[in-house]
């Protein structure tokens, strides 16, 4: 005889109800990958009609899949007026993007294991670094892994970091540190802030100057409010100095081009001055300015595919080989 009949009865009732709950949840979450794919298309293309065109289907099909997903989850995922995801929709979209990335990684891994490393790898890169890194990187990828399809995206750190986080990019070379907590960062190199001076300017040939000397001359700068400019202004303000702007140019590559064409000296990150042919200009190092760090970021919540790992290894090798020969760049990548 059961010495605890009441307890046994309660346990049996709880177990029965728990099994019923599990069955109900499982049956209500009959979502499929097509529903998630259609939801992502609506969010990324910002309308049902644009999503339908991207998916090569009719709008009613997209609407049906999204509506079924909303019914199964018991909540609205897309606000039909603003066409923006709701709070619940954002949560689903974040996970759906990771699922999409993992599914593509599965296919790429199997192909790479059976044959050669193959598949598409999406690489973001800040423009200043891309100027001298892109050509050797793409060349080395082609030599080592001809079946790889690299896609290179040139943009700013503030644009690239979120795209790595949401799965649009597999990795990105950006200025660090980044604020996104979901990103994993690997240091690549630090770069000095350097002056490019026309050959006939008093700074030309100086080799190295201090902050006081820099403040005596009018130089081209990025605008106030940009990360690069604000960091420099803070450092000079800390020692009681202020820069004189000959012009403010919103774009480091344009700023470098103007300096090389002889308009005026420009204060630039070292990677922005790499790759230009020699001419009637001079590079001047500045003592007292902190270096700017550059690193490789990837989403820490996903497992990189074999093509992504192969691309990362090639990128590391290119940095180790090429970066030490660029003026003002100091490799921080581990051996």
Range-by-range predicted roles:
Residues 72-73, 92-114:
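Alpha-helical linker/hinge and terminal dimerization helices associated
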Residues 118-181, 249:
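Central regulatory/effector-binding core of bacterial HTH transcription factors
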Residues 180-219:
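Flexible hinge/capping segments at coil-to-helix
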Residues 70-87:
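A short LG(V/I)-centered, amphipathic sequence patch enriched
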Residues 181-187, 191, 253-303:
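Beta-alpha-beta core module
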Residues 40-58:
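Short helix-boundary/capping micro-motifs
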Residues 156-161, 165-169, 174-175, 225-282:
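Hydrophobic hinge/microswitch elements
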Residues 204, 218-239, 304-314, 318-331:
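Secondary-structure junction motif
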């Amino acid at each position: 005889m059961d010495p605890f009949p009441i307890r046994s009865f309660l346990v049996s009732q709880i177990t029965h109800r728990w099994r019923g709950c599990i069955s109900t949840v499982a049956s209500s979450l009959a979502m499929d990958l097509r529903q998630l794919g259609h939801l992502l298309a609506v969010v990324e293309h910002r309308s049902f009609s644009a999503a339908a065109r991207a998916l090569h289907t009719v709008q009613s099909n997209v609407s049906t899949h999204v509506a079924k997903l909303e019914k199964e989850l018991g909540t609205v995922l897309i606000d039909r007026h603003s066409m923006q995801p709701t709070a619940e929709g954002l949560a689903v979209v974040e996970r759906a993007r990771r699922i999409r990335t993992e599914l593509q990684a599965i296919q790429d891994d199997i192909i790479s294991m059976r044959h050669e490393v193959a598949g598409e790898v999406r690489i973001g890169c800040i423009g200043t670094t891309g100027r001298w890194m892109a050509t050797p990187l793409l060349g080395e990828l082609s030599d080592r892994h001809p079946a790889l399809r690299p896609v290179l995206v040139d943009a700013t750190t503030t644009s690239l970091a979120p795209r790595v986080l949401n799965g649009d990019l597999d990795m990105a070379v950006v200025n660090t540190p980044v604020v996104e907590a979901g990103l994993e960062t690997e240091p690549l190199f630090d770069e000095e802030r350097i002056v490019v001076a026309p050959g006939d300017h008093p700074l030309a040939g100086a080799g190295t100057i201090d902050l006081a000397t820099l403040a005596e001359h009018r130089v081209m700068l990025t605008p106030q409010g940009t990360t690069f400019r604000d960091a420099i202004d803070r450092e000079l303000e800390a020692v009681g100095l202020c820069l004189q702007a000959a012009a403010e140019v919103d774009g480091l590559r344009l700023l470098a081009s103007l300096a090389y064409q002889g308009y005026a000296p420009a204060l630039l990150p070292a990677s922005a001055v790499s790759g230009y042919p020699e001419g009637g200009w001079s590079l001047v190092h500045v003592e007292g300015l902190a270096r700017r760090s550059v690193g490789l970021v990837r989403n820490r919540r996903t497992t990189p595919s074999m093509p992504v790992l192969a691309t990362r290894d090639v990128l590391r090798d290119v940095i180790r080989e090429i970066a030490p020969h660029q003026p003002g760049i100091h490799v921080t990548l581990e051996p």
